[in-house]
Amino acid sequence: MRKISRILLLFFLLSTSIFGNEPLITKEKAPLSVALPLLKSIDQYAIIIGSGPTHMYAFIDPVCPRSREFVSMIVESAKMQERYTYHFFYYELTRFHTKNMIGTIYNATRPLEMMKTIMVDEKEVSVMTTFSSDITKEINAISDVAEKLDIYKRPYLFVVKPQKGGQ
């Protein structure tokens, strides 16, 4: 009986180590041929940092620790800003309940500065609870595209390299 229980335990441990390494979420990213027209349709709402030839579209949440690390890394690196043009879109991770904060960022006179204050400096700001129809339209347009692209984590990135031959 002891031998059988040891064999079962060994089998259990082996199976959990093999199957435990499988990713929990196995989603395919939308191909760029599908994603790029959708991203271009909301580009007017992007907060842009950098001036490089390679464009990086990023969906971020203002409270998400990974998004904050990513934005801080870019803001603090002139080299990254020379290599890439970053197009940031705020898209709420529902567990953080940041829709009002996102609206506050987009409603700011200088959204880039507000973004840095919240995400890089990690300062508290007064969060608005009502927004103009234009801000609501921006947030909804970004959410619609994010849902079509099945964005499920933050930051979620699309990289568009410059075409060879200057085209």
Regions found by a protein language model. Give the residues of each.
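Short, internal strand/loop/helix patches
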Residues: 106-134
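Short Fe-S-cluster ligation motifs
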Residues: 96-107
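Extracytoplasmic thiol/disulfide redox context detector
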Residues: 16-97, 128-162
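Sec-dependent signal peptide recognition
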Residues: 2-10
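Sec-dependent N-terminal signal peptides of Gram-positive bacterial secreted proteins and lipoproteins
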Residues: 10-16
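Short, low-complexity, polar/charged sequence segments that are solvent-exposed and flexible
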Residues: 76-79, 105-109
